[in-house]
From Swiss-Prot:
Disulfide bonds: none annotated. It is an enzyme of class 2 (transferase). It catalyses: an N-terminal L-alpha-aminoacyl-[protein] + acetyl-CoA = N-terminal N(alpha)-acetyl-L-alpha-aminoacyl-[protein] + CoA + H(+); L-lysyl-[protein] + acetyl-CoA = N(6)-acetyl-L-lysyl-[protein] + CoA + H(+). Residues 1-93 form a transit peptide. Protein acetyltransferase with dual specificity triggering both N-alpha-acetylation (NTA) and epsilon-lysine acetylation (KA), possibly with a low efficiency or toward specific plastid substrates. The keyword Thylakoid does not apply. This is GCN5-related N-acetyltransferase 3, chloroplastic. Residues 94-237 form the N-acetyltransferase domain. It holds the Pfam family Acetyltransf_1. Keywords: Acyltransferase, Chloroplast, Plastid, Transferase, Transit peptide. It comes from Arabidopsis thaliana (Mouse-ear cress).
Amino acid sequence: MGLVGCVGKSSLVSMELRWARRRKSDNAASALPRSIPIYISTLKKDINLEELRNLYSLCNHSCNRLSEKDSNVEKIVDMKKLRRAISRSDVIVSVFCKPQHVDVDDAVLYSEEESLSSSLYTSEFGRQNKDDSFLGDLFQNAVPLTPSNGQLVGFGRAYSDYGLTASIHDLMVLPSLQRMGIGKLIVNRIVRLLTSRDIYDIAALCFEDERPFFKACGFGDDRMGSTTMMFTKSLEA
């Protein structure tokens, strides 16, 4: 796990509809469309906590930085802590796509873990599966993509002191939609929001195998060669 820094600047958009495209060499996802529309939001009101918690699980992303990197995430942070973390995060970026554009395995896992009682996205149209009728798919494709009818497939957040420094945490993209540039879009949006507030000392808390990705996003080692250290000593009564 390390700490890397970045500098950047650009304009602000709180909501945006973009297209994500798969690489031609990515044969693993050949059954899925090569280009899909995605909805990018920086509004906290668009986040459904139950869907976000499911995304943590689907991405095998743990909030516990002391856990093993490759171990399965059996217990996600509880809902109260997650709600508090989101409410106190300074920057939130979420990405949505239409449910039929998600890999069927991810869709099945998502459906099994989704709590319908707390979901904001239940509607009379339901979520589309590959065996749905042609008319149902046609209608779903015609409906404009929004957070209310889309599935949360990407997420990232940042904390700052509102003056000097900020750090990026919990960057996630649904496995079947990785390698489409969605993660880079999330990082770039976070950086633009922070630099618009005149905050340029931006760090990313990441694992060693994530460093090449952040390097491609413009991050690098700081001048002091510093690294992150976690408190590991048990507190004595």
